[in-house]
Amino acid sequence: MKGSRPEQAVLTRDTDMSKTDDTRAVIEGMVDGLNDHRIGDIGEFFSENFRWMGNQGCGQKIGLREFQDNWQRPFQAAFSDKVCIDEARLYMGEWAAAFGRQEATHSGEFLGIKATGKRIEIRYMDFWKVVDGKIVDNWVWTCSTVKAGKPMTAATALPQHLNKRG
């Protein structure tokens, strides 16, 4: 690289690799909990003040209650039979990442879109930081399709996706 190199990977610089198994247990339990459609007691896996950082259309939720009330409950109501399928997971100390898909029937209104009854697939990537057995940060990126070389986020791809699938 020409010139001075910007500092890289600051958040993972002091990762404690001895915490990898604990992180794995938290993430596996959380995904099972989401697939069991748990909402009220999902705090078993999330810090009370955790940050959920979604991409365009999803926004940012600060704290467990905001996540539950402004994302998890509306999403679950709109996709009542949804299941998360992580296709790959990576664990490194307090950090974990996954990519995969959610499969569901669009059974209720979501992001202003009336229920269509259609099956959908939402692709995602998640990155988590776990501290003291709880998720404190969750970065999320979702994409249902690619059009004209540009990723389409949940806010723009979901309406198109709901109109295409049968």
Task: Please provide the spans of the model-predicted regions.
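Short beta-strand edge/turn micro-motifs at domain boundaries
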Residues: 4, 121-151
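A short, structured loop/turn motif at beta-sheet edges
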Residues: 89-97, 129-136
